[in-house]
């Protein structure tokens, strides 16, 4: 849970990864937003363009990890901390965004 991973919030979904409690990522503190900007990479460990360099990965939510507004990003972003049990399982219903029984969290 406290394993440091400076790349956990990177990618085009960087901001959702930092701000979505179900994304599998978190910041060390509320003042550390990990990301350089909305769409750029988060801290790389060098501190360039970042407030802090200690971005950490949170323990993914144990249920409903791919649901909500960021459902697609959570299911498709390898850095999101979530995964689907199979490639054909999108985890969430795109219409009402309800939880799927087969949704799983990645380790």
Curated annotation (Swiss-Prot):
GO terms for molecular function: cadmium ion binding. Transmembrane segments: none annotated. The keyword Metal-binding applies. Keywords: Cadmium, Metal-binding, Metal-thiolate cluster. It comes from the Eukaryota. Belongs to the metallothionein superfamily. Type 7 family. The metallothioneins are involved in the cellular sequestration of toxic metal ions. Binds 12 cadmium ions per molecule. This is Metallothionein-1. It comes from Tetrahymena thermophila.
């Amino acid at each position: 849970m406290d394993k440091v991973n400076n790349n956990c919030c990177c990618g085009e979904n960087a901001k959702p990864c930092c701000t979505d409690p179900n994304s599998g990522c978190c910041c060390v503190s509320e003042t550390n937003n990990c990301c350089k900007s909305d769409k750029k990479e988060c801290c790389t460990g060098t501190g360039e363009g970042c407030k802090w360099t200690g971005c950490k990965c949170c323990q993914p939510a144990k249920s409903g990890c791919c649901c909500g507004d960021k459902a697609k990003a959570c299911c498709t972003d390898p850095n999101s901390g979530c995964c689907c049990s199979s490639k054909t399982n999108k985890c969430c219903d795109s219409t009402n965004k309800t939880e799927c029984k087969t949704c799983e969290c990645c380790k």
